Amino acid sequence: MEGKKEIDFSKKFNSLMGENNTYEFFLKMQYVMPKYSKKKDPIFFSFLIFAIEHLAKYKEDESISSLFIQSMQLYLKNHPDKKIENPSYFMNTYHKIYKMIPVKSDKSLFKYNYLELCDANGISEDDILKENIYYEFAVDSRENKFLLEGYKFAMKSMKLDIINDVVKDILETDKYKMDEKEKKIFVARTCLEILVNKDKKMALDFILPFINAKDNYETNEPLCNMAYFICLLLNDKNVTFEKFKEIINMYKPNIEKVDILLKKYINKISFDNYNQLVFPEANNPLSGFNIMGMMKLVGNLSNLMRGN
């Protein structure tokens, strides 16, 4: 028996296919999406890809993001078996759509909406990491010069190559008006953040290019030296908390000049490795410190999220 004929969506919506009708096209897609979201995979995804491809042709990035999120919410609602049990299914769908958006486009809205949808549907951080989503987001943000957004995703990806690339770009640009000392503090903070994420070897590999061992390390920014020595200690299983604290106390005057956040990084690292705190007085809730310390150094929240 002959199979069902594929739907020619371009013929079906021909009157809205012109360049001057993109908004009307988008509204029509929104209107008919509830109907198509009830269809089986081939029809639904054929329709969704048709709509996204047309909007991508005219670089309608916000419309793409909005339509994708709406369509997936409806689809997951109508097909609950696809909801949480198979996160890779949703990831694969995302990949198909994401690659249709022009490379030189602001995909920020798409990224944040996508991550919200993952969270709402029980897709874990581990699943996102396995699919290299954060890495892809970071690469894209960097290519589009949204460096602080790229930094955020690079740090979440925990891939050293993209972390190095984004940090290098941030240090070389005049956009954030950092002097040389602030740049070195930013490097030290990044190293500590990698340690907070519990990758001791990566932290050491990251900080090494910024360390000059000549003249007893005196030509380096003190906080870079501190980050380097912390990495060395943590990579040695025989080092005690007392030795760790001794190194921190050597640099306490330098730490005091930065902000309370640096102490929270050190506390988190100390607690994870030795189950003790170096700065008990700074032990307020540790949530929300990940990117916020860098924000104080290089820009406000809106700049951070949009990379402006």
What is each model feature region?
Residues 20, 59-60, 76-80, 98-102, ...:
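Helix-turn/linker elements and helix-coil junctions of extended alpha-helical scaffolds
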Residues 3-11, 23-27, 128-132, 144, ...:
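Amphipathic alpha-helical repeat elements characteristic of tetratricopeptide repeat
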Residues 68-198, 202, 207:
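Eukaryote-skewed repeat-based solenoidal scaffolds used as protein-protein interaction platforms
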Residues 23, 31, 36, 58, ...:
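Sequence-level detector for tyrosine residue identity
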Residues 1-85:
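Eukaryote-specific detector of the first structured module of a protein
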Residues 16, 36, 55-56, 141, ...:
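Hydrophobic side-chain positions on well-ordered alpha-helices
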Residues 9, 146-308:
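Structured C-terminal portions of repeat-based eukaryotic scaffold domains
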Residues 1-4, 12-15, 31, 46, ...:
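Extended alpha-helical solenoid/rod scaffold regions
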